[in-house]
Amino acid sequence: MTGLSAEQFAWLAAEVAVLVDWDAPTGRPRSLPLRTALVVVLFLLRHNLPEDAAGELFGCSTATIWRYQEELEPVIDVVLSVLAAQITAQAHRDGALVDGLVAPVGERDGVEHLYSGKKRYCGQNVQVVANLDGRVVDVGEPYPGSMYDSRAFEASGIAERWRAHYQPGGLGLTGDKGYQGTGIITPDKKQPGQARSDTAKEYNRSVSRIRAAVERAIAHLKNWKILKTGYRRALSDFPRVLRTVTKLEIYRAFG
């Protein structure tokens, strides 16, 4: 239901309880106990049900669901920040992979450049770094879905944070042909009017084999359905929600 094991959820709930005075003696009584409220928040990130449906399921109002999301998601982010930073630091000791996903967000009034011609829907371009085992280790700041991966790679902060990997003598950062020209390892580009050599073909096959791991990592990240089936909340909140989901996925995979 939450995307986490029972042990992982228990630890997270205990850490959140330290930071949140949930049952304060003053103020309005809570509709749900803290552990149940935390289940609700994780459930919505994992399954992306409408908030009114979640309210029906858990026996509280839609307004209460919204309030718990706004209150608990930042706390989850804080609790998991140290672990996420440690995992990212460890990942810098080996080769890495990068790819982009476009998280659907729908059309938004007054917001331009969300439409991805490649994906054929409106979304946010999210740059994802994975280790060679196919687990997410870093995610960049989101940008409009119309932005090419090569540009989003630079704009999102990923290029700078992983620059040492694709400098001479670096451990290597590999991407698909959408990253050609950025300096990272990419498939060989076929020149017009020239046949691709057997060596180039084998090189491209080896790059594809390596890149399969980042595709697995993105599939795991998109199991948090809020990044797959349509983000409906305020677009201004998307970067924060993305950071929280990224840390939850890192915790799920490494915790």
Residue ranges and their predicted role:
Residues 55-67, 73-74, 78-255:
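Short, well-ordered secondary-structure "scaffold" segments embedded in the functional core
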Residues 1-27, 81:
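Charged, often Cys/His-bearing segments associated with DNA-binding zinc-finger transcription factors
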Residues 33-48:
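Short, amphipathic alpha-helical "recognition" segments used to contact nucleic acids or chromatin
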Residues 52:
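Residues within the helices of the helix-turn-helix
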Residues 24-30, 231-235:
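Short, surface-exposed loop/turn segments at secondary-structure junctions
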Residues 21-23, 36, 200:
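Glycine/charged-rich beta-loop-alpha catalytic/anionic-binding loops adjacent to active sites
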